[in-house]
Every structure is written in structure tokens, then in C-alpha cells.
Regions:
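Catalytic or ion-coupling anion/metal-binding cores of large enzyme and transporter domains
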Residues: 1-230
């Protein structure tokens, strides 16, 4: 069994505490948790928010999916450095990129990724700073309308480097294109649609189609006496 984060082996912790799981077996389980440096190798908060930053147009295309030890990371870092200097010279500000369309796109992408539910609070905070009217109800609508397409743990079977190898975020966005506002601007100087126009899905089991999703509904906002506002 493969793990992409520390939450995977937690179910064996009671056995370790009770003494029914030998220490050497626990150490074997621990060694399977991390495959490289970097963030946890599942669609947790870090992987989710870097992806949403890319969808909102605030990072270079494909940057969010590159594994920590991949040489493409160095290339993208250099390209990002060059690009941000040009953006400063051109007086392009975050407010020129992040708007209602980009935030709605990010919400839908987060749902399709099977991403962290922390994305809801982060996106709402970003929206408020950007002057957008995006709300928790809007996030709930996305959760009910958009299926999970990324077959990545914890919602699916695979781990992040396999998602990257299958085409990563740009490829998944091509599957989701009918739900997106593709004219949204990005820091590349091109639109979101133009950025993903050449992306291809390398493994249709890792990045599913709208007709064959991992799950038909991803999330719903719950309201009740403990959380009347959701």
C-alpha cells in the first residue's frame, strides 16, 4: 500500500500503542509515507492551494504540479524570476489578474481536484481582499455541480507525482474546460484557456473525464446549530 502523507498510517497507531504491531513493522510503514522532499504527496492543503494559485493566474503554467526533485522546478523558478521582473516593469498588479472569474475558476478546479476543504476559507479571504463577492454559498454550488476528476489521494488512488506524470493541473483543466471561464487573465500574459490549450492527459485513470469521474459530487457545505453560517 502507498501513502502520500502522515494521515495514511494513522489507522495503525492504536495497534502500535497497544503493542500488537511490532516496532520494525511500524518503521516500515513510516518509511513509505514520504517519497521525496517537498509537501505531502497527496492533494492536501499545500498541493491544493498551489494549484488554485495557478488557476487564478498567479503562477506559471504547470508550476503547481511539478514534483520537488524534478529538474523542471529549476527551469520554472528561473522563468518565474524573469517574468515577475517584467510584470513589475509593466505595472501589472495582482488586482489586474485576480477577479471574479479567476476565483470562480479556482473554486471549480479545487472541487475537481478533490482538494482540501481549507480552500474554501482561503478563497473567500482572497476574494475579500480582491473585492470579489465570492461566498461560501458559491463554493457550495461548485461542490454540487463539479465532479472529482483527479484520482489522487485522499479522494482517489494515486499520489501527486503520478498526477504530474499524467499531465498535472493543465491537463485536468482541459477536462474541466466546459465549466471554466477561459478568458480569465494570467501572469503569463495569456488567458487561462490559451495556457492550457496544448495540455494533454497522459493517463485517463489518473485524470478522469467528466463522463467517468472519481465521484459525481465532491463536497457540500453543512449548516446547523453548531455552524449556522456553514
Amino acid at each position: 500500500e502507498r501513502f502520500g502523507s502522515g494521515t495514511g498510517p494513522f489507522r495503525w497507531a492504536p495497534e502500535l500503542i497497544a503493542g500488537s504491531l511490532p516496532l520494525d513493522e511500524w518503521e516500515t510503514i513510516e518509511q513509505k509515507i514520504w517519497s521525496s522532499p517537498g509537501t505531502c504527496n497527496v492533494m492536501g492543503t499545500a498541493s491544493t492551494m498551489t494549484a488554485l494559485a495557478e488557476v487564478m493566474g498567479m503562477s506559471l503554467t504547470g508550476a503547481s504540479s511539478v514534483p520537488a526533485m524534478d529538474s523542471r522546478g529549476h527551469q520554472l523558478a528561473a522563468a518565474a524570476g524573469r517574468r515577475i521582473v517584467q510584470l513589475v516593469w509593466d505595472d501589472v498588479k495582482p488586482s489586474d489578474i485576480i477577479g471574479d472569474a479567476s476565483i470562480r475558476n479556482a473554486a471549480k478546479a479545487g472541487v475537481a481536484l478533490g482538494g482540501s476543504t481549507n480552500a474554501a476559507s482561503h478563497l473567500i479571504a482572497i476574494a475579500r481582499r480582491a473585492g470579489s463577492g465570492f461566498t461560501l454559498e458559491a463554493f457550495d454550488d461548485s461542490g454540487r455541480q463539479v465532479p472529482v476528476l483527479a484520482n489522487v489521494q485522499p479522494s482517489g488512488e494515486y499520489i501527486m507525482h503520478e498526477f504530474a506524470d499524467a499531465g498535472g493541473l493543465p491537463a485536468m483543466l482541459t477536462r474541466l474546460a466546459s465549466q471554466l471561464e477561459l478568458e480569465a487573465p494570467t501572469v503569463t500574459g495569456a488567458t487561462l484557456g490559451e495556457n492550457i490549450s496544448h495540455a494533454k492527459v497522459g493517463d485517463p485513470d489518473v485524470i478522469r473525464s467528466m463522463d467517468n469521474p472519481v465521484a459525481t459530487e465532491a463536497l457540500a457545505v453543512l449548516k446547523g446549530n453548531l455552524a449556522p453560517n456553514g
